[in-house]
Structure formats: C-alpha cells, structure tokens
Amino acid sequence: MKSFKRITRSLGMLAASAGAMLAFTGPSSAQETFKVGIVTFLSGPAAESFGVPAGKAAEFVIGELNKGAGPAPYNKVGFGGMKIEPVIIDENGGATKQVQELRNLYQRDNVDAVIGYISSGDCLAVAPIAEELKKPLFLFDCGTPRIFEEAKYNYVFRTAAHATQDNVGLIRYMKMKNIKMDTFSAINQDYAWGQDSRADFVAAAAQLYPNAKLGADLLPKFGAGQYGTEVSALVAAGSDVVYSSLWGGDLQAFILQSVPRGLAKRSQLVLSASDHVLPPLGDKMPDGVIIGARGAYGLMSPKTPLNEWFFSGYEKAYGVYPVQAAYRVTQSILGVKNAVEKAMAKNGGKKPSTDELVAAMTGSEWQSPGGLIQMKNGDGHQAIQPIAFSRTKYNAEKKRIDLVDIVNFEAECVNPPPGVKAIDWIKGGMKNDKCK
C-alpha cells in the first residue's frame, strides 16, 4: 500500500507545482492550467502489474511535458503552453463508486477532462455519465467493443483499440506459427472484458481453425484469486491450446497455480493481454507461452525516438521497463495534447472549449511510443492501432523473461472497418487488404 500512496502524493505534488515550473511557451495565460482527472487502479488485485504502472507513466509523462522535455512533436510545455494539473483517483471499488467519482471530478474538482478506466465494467458505467454532463472523457484502456457498438457518444473517446484486435491478432499469429489447435479450452473472467474476449477468440478460431473443438470453457469471477478447480478442469481436458484473457492479479495467480501442476507442458498457453505480468513473475513464467500486450508495447515496442524517450525514461525513473497499461495511458495523454494544440492552432491560441476539444479529437491521429494511433472507428471516437505477439523465453543473463518470435500486425489487419460490429466482421471472415 505504501507504493500506492507514494504515487498519489507524487502526482499531487506534480499538480501543486505546475505553476512553479518552467515558463509557458505560446499565447496562453501564464496562470492558465489544464486540469485533468486520471483514473487507474492504485489498490486491489488490478493494481500491482496494471494500475500502478499506468499511474507511474502518467506521473513521468506529465512531469516531462510540464518541463517542455518531450520529444518533437510533443516538446511544447504542457498542453499548448498550459501546465497540466493532474488529479489522480483510485479505480478500485466497483462501477457504482466510479460513477460518483467521475461526477466529483467534473463537478467538484472542475477538471477540464478525464483520462481513465481500465475495467470494461467501469467504462460501460461511466461513459453515459460523461455524455450526460457534456464533459470530455478519454478512455485509455478498457477493452470491451460494446462502448461504441451499443451507443453513440459525442464527448467520449477511447484512445486505444478494443479487444477484437487482441484476439484476431492472436489467432492470426497462431496460424502463422503453425500452432496445432484441434482442441482448445478457455478461462476468462465473468464480466464484459472476459466475455467479449472469449466471444472474439472463439469466433476468430472458427475462421482459421474451423475444425477446432472447444473443451473446458470456464468463467470465474473477476478477482477470484484461487483457481485450483479451474486448473484441475483444464489439466483434465488436455486440450492442445488453453486460451485466456485473464489480466492483473488474476493472471499472476493463475500462472503461479497452474505451472506447478504442469498445465503449460500439457497445453500451449495463449494469453491475449499478458505482457504486464512478466516483470513481477520473472522466472515463474514458463518458456514458450504465446502472449499479447494489447498493442506493440514493452519488449515488443518499436525502435523510434519517441519510444526510446518513454521506455528509457520510465525505466530510469522506476527501475523496471514499461508495460501495456503504461503505454496506453501515455498514448491517451499524448492524444489529448495533440487535440488541445490542434484546437488552439485554430482558435488563436486560447484554451479550447469543450466543443473545440471534441472537434479536434474526433477522427484525429497521432504518433505514440507504441506506433500510430488513428481515431477511425466509432464515428471518429474509437482508436485503432498496430499490435504485436510473441513467445516467452527466460534470459538467465538478464534474469528476466525476454520475448522472441515477435510478429507485428498493422491496425487494419486486426480491427474491424468503420461501421461494422466486431463480431460481425470476424464471422464474415475478417476481410481486409492489410494482412501480409
């Protein structure tokens, strides 16, 4: 718990010192700031490997931007010369609590925008509230495709691709690497993320592995922590492949409980969103596991000056390399910066109104440490992006898990085209012209 409090305090200090840092560049008032709520798990099972790295990344990136120390094109101080004033909130506590916390951020703390939410259940709950209040909300991580498939929003954006890319990409990777899958089993959390991930994987498998049979199909509750019964069922099933979208503390617990019982030797483990557990698990993660990171992140990230700035800076600051949640909150912050400065270029350098910010973000694109982000889907409110997959291999010299057999997929190869529901696109054969 000490680490969570330290992050909260340091972000609070960052916010308090915003006005005392380097002088602004640009026509915006010297006293003007851009106040942004940041919501991530700082406690609970989703914190250690997921929420806290996101909080640390927000701290690092906002600190660098407020000093004007970002690489081009992000080298203007803050957002268009305005210092960024963060207000960080713990996402732990459930959807009802997060709805009230979001209202508090807008109505009590008077934030200009909110960047947040890892849980798909939380995203589904808070998106209508932002729309009701007519306030900008930038969802940085949650994966359910339902956000923009079941509703239309003007003030809500998701600055990262949804779960369809994780599962379509995973199946494409498996086929490319000639992974045998006559039979497969699945274990996913029983809420929006796990249900939607499972549906996408099963549907994609039907396209590229049409004869594969589904065996054990398990849906433990989020935060279950104990998987003895489930591991027994998976070992007994003896499937060629065990697929899972488990994440955070649940995934760590599953690996620690299943590996000693030989599951990874009996079946090929394929984990759609798992790079974030590599640092805490270390050599407890077996070799040969196929993993995704929900993007081209961490040890699968591109070699660019922007990624070098982020990867090296984060690693130097915190003693560990950044993983998916850190990348996803960073691309959201940079996306908002891009939109704010785009709006200011149009309005003569003034702090943009909500409507100006919304217009600038809709359909925009920007470079991130993980590659190009394009707001192409959801009427310009839903991002698509590149993604990478690989296998685990322990590096005894570095005393860490490395990733080998890395394959990158372009965004259009693993995401549905505009106006098409993800599951319909998958069942229609995942047609596109961007796959090699």
List where the protein language model places each region:
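Bacterial N-terminal signal peptides that target proteins for export
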Residues: K2-A15
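Sec/Tat signal peptide C-region and signal peptidase I cleavage site
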Residues: L22-A30
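Extracytoplasmic "Venus flytrap"
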Residues: G37-V61, I89-A95, I118-S119, I187-D196, ...
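Extracytoplasmic ligand/sensor domains, especially the bilobed periplasmic-binding protein
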Residues: K56, T96, V111-L218, R266-G292
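Signal peptide-proximal N-terminal region
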Residues: K56-P86, A206-A212
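Short, well-structured alpha-helical segments in soluble
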Residues: I88-D112, M176, Q226-G238
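Extracellular/periplasmic periplasmic-binding protein-like sensory domains
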Residues: S258-Q331, E341-N347, D402-K434
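Solvent-exposed, acidic/polar segments of extracytosolic/periplasmic ligand-binding ectodomains
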Residues: S364-K436
